[in-house]
Every structure is written in structure tokens, then in C-alpha cells.
């Protein structure tokens, strides 16, 4: 089980990312627009770095298990770590997943 503070920090980052998504996309489109002058593009880049919170970046979000908060071995399709997924599948609580045999 992960520390509750780490789970809360990740949830706060997800919320910040959603809150600043449009603003960040606007600034990135200005930065990548080759038709604009270098000064405007540089100004957009400095606003992106200085004005927006660091945790509002999507890259800082960590995929965590929905039940335990474990940061490693998380299957994106299920949102669960490998250990919890194995337990739930063995009890038949994940629909459509069966134990393989050949």
C-alpha cells in the first residue's frame, strides 16, 4: 500500500493538469508556430515555464493502482497493479479474463 500522501499528491497533479490543460495547449501551439516571430515564441515559452505550476504538466502524473496506489506494474487497461489484478482474476471478479491453458 502506497503512502496516502503520495496518492493525494498524484490526485492533486491530475486536477492541476485538467485545470491548466487549455492554457498549456495554447502556449505550446504558439511555441510551435513557425510563422510567428522568435520573440513571441520565446515569450510564450517563458510564460509556460514561469507562470504555470510545474505540477500542471501531464508528464508529472504517475499511473497508480486504483485500489492500492502502487506506482509500479500497473496495467493501463484495468488501472490495477499486477498483484491486485492477479488476485481479482483468480476469484473471477474481472469480467472477460480467464486463466490461460494450452
Curated annotation (Swiss-Prot):
UniProt keyword annotations, A-Z: Ribonucleoprotein, Ribosomal protein, RNA-binding, rRNA-binding
Keyword Ribonucleoprotein applies: yes
Molecular function, one GO term: rRNA binding
InterPro entries, A to Z: Ribosomal_uS14, Ribosomal_uS14_bac/plastid, Ribosomal_uS14_CS
GO annotations of cellular component type: cytoplasm; small ribosomal subunit
Entry-linked Gene3D superfamilies: 1.10.287.1480
One of the GO BP terms on file: translation
Pfam families per the UniProt record, alphabetical: Ribosomal_S14
Superkingdom of source: Bacteria
Keyword Ribosomal protein: yes
Subunit and interaction comment: Part of the 30S ribosomal subunit. Contacts proteins S3 and S10.
NCBIfam families: PRK08881.1 (NF006477)
Task performed by this protein: Binds 16S rRNA, required for the assembly of 30S particles and may also be responsible for determining the conformation of the 16S rRNA at the A site.
Family: Belongs to the universal ribosomal protein uS14 family.
Protein name per its UniProtKB record: Small ribosomal subunit protein uS14
Organism, as annotated: Wolbachia pipientis subsp. Culex pipiens (strain wPip)
Amino acid at each position: 500500500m502506497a503512502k496516502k500522501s503520495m496518492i493525494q499528491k498524484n490526485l492533486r497533479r491530475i486536477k492541476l493538469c485538467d485545470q491548466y490543460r487549455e492554457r498549456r495547449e495554447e502556449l505550446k501551439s504558439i511555441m510551435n508556430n513557425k510563422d510567428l516571430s522568435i520573440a513571441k515564441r520565446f515569450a510564450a515559452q517563458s510564460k509556460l515555464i514561469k507562470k504555470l505550476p510545474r505540477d500542471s504538466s501531464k508528464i508529472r502524473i504517475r499511473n497508480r493502482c486504483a485500489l492500492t496506489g502502487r506506482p509500479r506494474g500497473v496495467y493501463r487497461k484495468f488501472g490495477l497493479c499486477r498483484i491486485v489484478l492477479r488476485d481479482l482474476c483468480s476469484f473471477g471478479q474481472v469480467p472477460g479474463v480467464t486463466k490461460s491453458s494450452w
